[in-house]
A protein has these predicted regions:
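Intrinsically disordered, low-complexity, charged terminal extensions of DNA damage-control enzymes
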Residues: 1-44
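A short, structure-level motif marking secondary-structure boundaries and short turns
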Residues: 12, 34, 51, 73-74, ...
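Generic alpha-helix structural propensity
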Residues: 21, 44, 48, 60-64
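Alpha-helical ds-nucleic-acid-binding substructure associated with the helix-hairpin-helix region
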Residues: 25, 29, 57-58, 62-138
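An alpha-helix initiation/capping motif
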Residues: 43, 47, 125-128
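Short, aromatic/basic-rich helix-turn unit that serves as a nucleic-acid recognition element
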Residues: 48-52, 56
Length: 145
């Protein structure tokens, strides 16, 4: 039987403690270094777009491309799916995003704008339902979801 668990700070810390009791090397390592705290991203749309941008390239290059991508939009306003749908795909390509990734980002924007992915209730869904919804978007696989 599989149990679905939402990975949060408490679950992660509990898991690390359990692993540490079974592995002295891990325990020593964790005593030396702090447990990483993963920030929780509330802008699901941008998080998914950013995941596509970062795929299969170095973090440094992806950060530069991501920053150039964001510069296409008004920095004072949260980028919306409508903004992405309105922008010409060539402009997206010109900041260093491949044609394929650009089309995936447009697909994500389309899914959010049509409420195929509803940001308002996504935090209430279990992991499997979120994965099912996200992977219904062309260009979003399990690893991205």
């Amino acid at each position: 039987m599989t149990t679905n668990v939402t990975l949060g700070k408490e679950v992660m810390i509990d898991g690390i403690k359990k692993l540490s009791t079974n592995d002295i090397r891990l325990k020593t390592f964790l005593q030396k270094f702090r447990v990483p705290v993963l920030p929780i991203e509330k802008n699901y749309f941008w998080s998914l777009c950013r995941s596509v941008i970062y795929q299969q390239i170095s973090g440094k290059a992806a950060k530069k491309i991501s920053d150039r991508y964001l510069s296409l939009f008004d920095q004072d306003v949260k980028m919306t799916p409508a903004d992405v749908l309105d922008i010409d795909i060539e402009k997206i390509n010109n900041v260093g995003i491949s044609r394929q990734k650009s089309s995936y980002i447009k697909n994500i924007a389309d899914a959010f704008s049509k409420k195929i992915i509803n940001e308002k209730n996504i935090s209430e869904l279990d992991d499997q339902e979120i994965i099912k919804q996200l992977t219904s978007i062309k260009g979003v696989g399990r690893w991205t979801a």
